[in-house]
Amino acid sequence: MRIIAKRTLQNFWEEHPNSKQQLLSWYQVFDKNIFDNSNAIKLIFGSADFVGNNKVVFNICGNHYRLIVKINYVTQIVYILFVGTHTEYDSLKDIKNL
């Protein structure tokens, strides 16, 4: 899959170095695979939450950080919408409309 934009992840792990390994692992899995549907993602990322409108929330470093992406399964593009601390995630008003 094509991921837009890796730089968002890099900026985050520069501020939060303990997130780097897990964000890189997440990136590599999506970069090297084709996911046709949410079930395929759930097989690899069992704790992923599907919040509607093709948006998925991933726990990073246990539950310390959150990553929200939007996936276009037809074009195989993943858009990074949010990466932040759990506290920042909790302050989001409406995940479905990110």
Stretches found by the model and what they are:
Residues 1-64, 72-77, 86-98:
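Basic, Lys/Arg-enriched alpha-helical interface segments
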